[in-house]
C-alpha cells in the first residue's frame, strides 16, 4: 500500500492511497479458494469445482467484497500510523474505475480534532453572585401553604356571600332564551374572587344569601374557545344553595404534619431551604455562564468546520421554525438572513469550541458520568412529565441517542465543577433582584 499526504492545512488532511493490483489479486485468490472448499455444484465433488468456473460465477462479487475489506483496512492503517483523530466520518472517493488487474486508487479526506493544550485553571478568577432569601418571601410562601390547606364551612349567621366565600350553586345558562349545551350544573362549588368563571359572573353573586335566586347577565370573551358563544351576551339563572366561609388553618404543628414535617419550625426551615435552593440554582447557572464565557474568550484553537456546519444547521432549523411561527425576537427579525447566518455561525463555532475544550478537560481529569448521575437526571425528566413516568423511562431505555443527550449536560456540569474547584471563585453578595437579572440587560444605577 502506498500512502501520500496531499493536504495538511489546519485541521484538514487528505491522503492518496494506492492498493497494488497484486495485493487485490492475492486477496481475491484466497477468497476464491475459501469458496472452493465450501462450494457444492452438481457434477463436481466437494472442493473440486474448477477455479475458472468460480471466477466466472463469483469473480465480481468477490472482487467487491475484497475491495471493501482492503479499503477499510488501509484506512485504519493510515489512521493508526498517522495518529489521526477524526472529527467526523472521513470522505472516501475512488480516483478511477475499479478494474481487475489494476491498482486501486482512492482519496481519504477528513478533518482531525485539534490539539488542545492543558490549561492552568488556578489562574482563572470568577465572581459568584449570591443572595439570601428574604424573610418576607418565607412568610409569603408559608401563607400560600396555609391558603392551599384551607377548608370551607357553612356560614351560621345567615350572612350574605362575600369575596373569598364559596357558594354552592345550581345554574342554567341561556343564549337567546334557549339553554345551551354545557351551560348548566347542579351543586357547583364556586369560590368568589377566584376568577374561574366568565368575567363578571362571580361579582354578581356577591351579596347573595342561601336560598336566593339571581339572574346573572354576562358576555363571553371574544376569544372564547367555543365559537358559537364567543362575544355573546348570555343569561344565567342561578340559585344559591349554600354559602360557605373559608377556614384557614394556623401555622402550627398540625399544618406542618400535613406537609410531612414534624413541627411548624421544621416546616419554616424546609420552606426557607427550598427558596434558598432556588436562588442557589440561579447563582450556579450564572456562574457557569461566566465560566463558559471566560473559557470561550481564553481559547482560540481551530475547530473542525464539519462540526460547525452540523451545529449551525441545527441552530438554523430552529431559527427557520421561529420565523414560520412568528416567534423570532425583534432584534433578529430586523436582521437580514445574511447577517443572521453570520451571527449564528459564530454561536455554532463557539459551542463546538467549548464542547471540544470541555471534552478534553474531562478526559484529562478522568471525569465520568456514573449511573447514579444518570438516574438523577432521569428523575428530573420524570418530574417534567407527571403521569407519564413509565413511557419516559421506556423512551430512554430504548433510545441510545436520547440517553446520550441526557448524559451530555451531566458530563458538562461535572467538568465545569472540576474547573471551578481549581479556579479562584469569590462570592459577591447581591440583592435577589440583581441575582435574577439577566446579565445581558443593561445595567441600571442603584442608590
Swiss-Prot record:
The gene designation is: tig
Q: Which GO terms describe its biological process?
A: 'de novo' cotranslational protein folding; cell division; chaperone-mediated protein folding; protein transport; protein unfolding
> What are the residue boundaries of the PPIase FKBP-type domain, all occurrences included?
164-249
Keywords of the record: Cell cycle, Cell division, Chaperone, Cytoplasm, Isomerase, Rotamase
Going by the entry's taxonomy, the superkingdom of the source organism is recorded as Bacteria
The protein's job, in short, is: Involved in protein export. Acts as a chaperone by maintaining the newly synthesized protein in an open conformation. Functions as a peptidyl-prolyl cis-trans isomerase.
Q: Which family does it belong to?
A: Belongs to the FKBP-type PPIase family. Tig subfamily.
Give the species. Rhodospirillum rubrum (strain ATCC 11170 / ATH 1.1.1 / DSM 467 / LMG 4362 / NCIMB 8255 / S1)
Instruction: Tell me where in or outside the cell this protein is found.
Output: Cytoplasm
Q: What is this protein called?
A: Trigger factor
A Pfam cross-reference name = Trigger_N
Annotated domain remarks: Consists of 3 domains; the N-terminus binds the ribosome, the middle domain has PPIase activity, while the C-terminus has intrinsic chaperone activity on its own.
What one GO molecular function would you report for this record?
Answer: protein folding chaperone
Q: What is its EC number?
A: 5.2.1.8
One GO cellular component term noted in the UniProt record for this chain: cytoplasm
Amino acid at each position: 500500500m502506498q500512502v501520500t499526504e496531499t493536504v495538511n492545512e489546519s485541521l484538514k488532511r487528505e491522503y492518496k492511497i494506492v492498493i497494488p493490483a497484486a495485493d487485490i489479486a492475492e486477496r481475491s485468490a484466497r477468497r476464491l479458494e475459501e469458496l472452493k472448499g465450501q462450494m457444492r455444484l452438481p457434477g463436481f465433488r466437494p472442493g473440486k469445482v474448477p477455479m475458472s468456473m468460480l471466477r466466472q460465477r463469483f469473480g465480481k462479487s468477490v472482487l467487491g467484497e475484497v475491495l471493501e475489506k482492503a479499503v477499510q483496512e488501509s484506512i485504519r492503517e493510515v489512521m493508526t500510523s498517522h495518529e489521526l483523530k477524526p472529527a467526523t466520518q472521513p470522505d472516501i472517493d475512488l480516483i478511477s474505475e475499479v478494474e481487475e488487474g489494476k491498482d486501486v486508487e482512492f482519496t481519504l479526506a477528513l478533518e482531525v480534532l485539534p490539539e488542545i493544550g492543558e490549561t492552568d485553571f488556578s489562574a482563572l478568577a470568577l465572581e459568584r453572585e449570591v443572595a439570601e432569601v428574604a424573610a418576607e418571601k418565607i412568610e409569603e410562601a408559608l401563607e400560600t401553604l396555609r391558603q392551599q390547606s384551607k377548608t370551607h364551612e357553612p356560614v351560621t349567621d345567615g350572612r350574605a356571600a362575600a369575596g373569598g366565600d364559596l357558594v354552592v350553586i345550581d345554574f342554567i345558562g341561556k343564549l337567546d332564551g334557549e339553554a345551551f349545551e354545557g351551560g348548566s350544573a347542579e351543586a357547583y362549588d364556586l369560590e368568589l374572587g377566584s376568577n374561574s368563571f366568565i368575567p363578571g359572573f362571580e361579582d354578581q353573586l356577591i351579596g347573595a344569601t342561601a336560598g336566593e335566586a339571581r339572574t346573572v347577565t354576562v358576555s363571553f370573551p371574544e376569544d372564547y374557545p367555543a365559537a358559537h358563544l364567543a362575544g355573546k351576551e348570555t343569561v344565567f339563572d342561578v340559585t344559591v344553595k349554600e354559602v360557605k366561609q373559608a377556614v384557614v388553618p394556623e401555622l402550627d404543628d398540625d399544618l406542618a404534619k400535613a406537609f410531612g414535617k414534624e413541627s411548624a419550625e421544621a416546616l419554616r426551615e424546609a420552606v426557607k431551604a427550598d427558596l434558598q435552593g432556588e436562588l442557589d440554582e440561579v447563582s450556579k447557572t450564572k456562574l457557569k455562564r461566566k465560566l463558559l464565557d471566560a473559557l470561550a474568550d481564553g481559547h482560540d484553537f481551530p475547530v473542525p468546520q464539519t462540526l460547525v456546519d452540523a451545529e449551525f444547521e441545527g441552530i438554523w432549523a430552529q431559527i427557520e421554525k421561529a420565523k414560520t411561527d412568528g416567534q423570532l425576537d425583534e432584534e433578529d427579525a430586523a436582521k437580514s438572513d445574511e447577517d443572521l447566518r453570520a451571527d449564528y455561525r459564530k454561536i455554532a463555532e463557539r459551542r463546538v469550541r467549548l464542547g471540544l475544550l470541555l471534552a478534553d478537560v474531562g478526559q484529562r481529569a478522568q471525569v465520568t458520568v456514573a449511573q447514579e448521575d444518570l438516574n438523577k437526571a432521569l428523575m428530573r425528566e420524570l418530574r417534567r412529565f407527571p403521569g407519564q413516568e413509565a413511557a419516559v423511562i421506556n423512551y430512554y431505555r430504548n433510545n441510545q441517542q436520547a440517553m446520550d443527550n441526557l448524559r451530555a449536560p451531566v458530563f458538562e456540569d461535572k467538568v465545569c465543577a472540576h474547573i471551578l474547584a481549581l479556579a479562584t471563585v469569590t462570592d459577591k453578595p447581591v440583592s435577589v433582584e440583581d441575582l435574577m437579572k439577566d446579565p445581558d440587560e443593561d445595567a441600571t444605577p442603584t442608590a
